[in-house]
Amino acid sequence: MVSYKDLGLVNTREMFAKAIKGGYAIPAFNFNNMEQLQAIIKAAAAEKSPVILQVSKGARNYANATLLRYMAQGAVEYAKELGWEKPQIVLHLDHGDSFELCKNCIDFGFSSVMIDGSALPFEKNIELTKKVVEYAHQFDVTVEGELGVLAGVEDEVAHEHHTYTDPEEVIEFAQKTGCDSLAISIGTSHGAYKFTPAQCTRDENGKLVPPPLAFNVLDAVMEKLPGFPIVLHGSSSVPQDEVDTINMFGGKLPDAIGIPEEQLRKAAKSAVCKINIDSDSRLAMTAAVRRVFAEKPAEFDPRKYLGPARDNMEKLYRHKIVNVLGSAGKAE
C-alpha cells in the first residue's frame, strides 16, 4: 500500500471547494508519456494552477502502473524545481470500470479515482460507486461518480449516443454513494469528432458550428445539488489550427470538431470545477511531430520531434489554464 501523501500529491476535496467558490475550473489533463507530463507540469508551474494528472485504464496499461506512480512523484519534485513551492497536483484514475481497478490504483498511490458505472442500471451504478467510495475514503482518496452517458470514443470508452443526466436522480445518487464529485452529461463527447456534420450548422465560410451544450440540464443539476462539485468529460475544443496542420502534412481529420471555448468558460464559472481535456493535447502533439517530419524528412532523433511536441502541448495547456478555465494563480 502506497499513500499518495507520501508522494507529495493531494486529493481533490479542497481544490474543488475553492474552485466552486472562486468561479473557475481545475484542468484535468490526460497523459500517457513523459513529454505530456513535462508539458503539463511546466504549464501548471508557470501559471501556478492546481492540476489533475489523469490516467485512463488504457494509459495505465500502456505506461505501467509502477512507472506512473514514480512519474507522478517526480512531477511533484519537478514542479518544485521550476519554482512552484507548494504544488497542488492530483493523480486521478479516469473512467475506472471496476472496483478492482479503482482499488489497485488507490493502493498504488492515486489520490483520486473515477468509477464509471454510468452504463449500468441506476441502482447498480449506486451500488458500485458506493463500494468504491467506502474503500477510497478509508485512505482519504476522493471519488468521482458519473450519471449520464457521453457519446464518442476515447481509449477503451466508447458509446454511440448521448444520454443526458437526469437531474431528478442526482440527489439520490450523491446521498447514497457518498461520492465527492459527479460527472454529468450535457452534450460533450469523447474524441476529436464530438459532433457529426448533421448535428452542426455551418457559418458563412462553410466551417462547422457545433450545437450548444445543454446548460438547462447543468442548471437543474446545480439546483438539486447546490455547491456540489460537477465534472465535465469530453471537453476538448479540437483547435482548428492544429487540425489544419495535421491535415496539411498528410493527416486525415475531416470535419473534426470540439466544444467551443466560450461554452467551457461559461461552465467553469458555475459549479463545474473539473474539466477534462485529452484530445486537444493529442492533436497538439501530432501536429508538431507531423510538421517536423514534413520539414525535416531526414530527422530521426526523437528529441528533435518530441521536443517541439512537448513545447506545443505546453502552449496549449497554458492557454487552457489562463484563457478558458481561469485557474491561473489559484495555487500560489
Question: Which residues does each PLM region occupy?
Answer:
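Shared catalytic-loop signature of beta/alpha-barrel
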Residues: 60-64, 264, 273-291, 295-297, ...
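A short N-terminal beta->alpha junction/helix N-cap motif
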Residues: 3, 24-32, 59-60, 304, ...
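Generic N-terminal amphipathic, Lys/Arg-enriched alpha-helix
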Residues: 1-27, 299-300
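Extended, intrinsically disordered, low-complexity segments
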Residues: 288-332
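Alpha/beta enzyme core
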Residues: 10-21, 34-59, 66-86, 95-229, ...
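Short acidic/histidine-rich active-site segments
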Residues: 234-237, 257, 277-281
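Short catalytic-loop micro-motif centered on adjacent basic/acidic residues
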Residues: 26-30, 91-92, 114, 230-232, ...
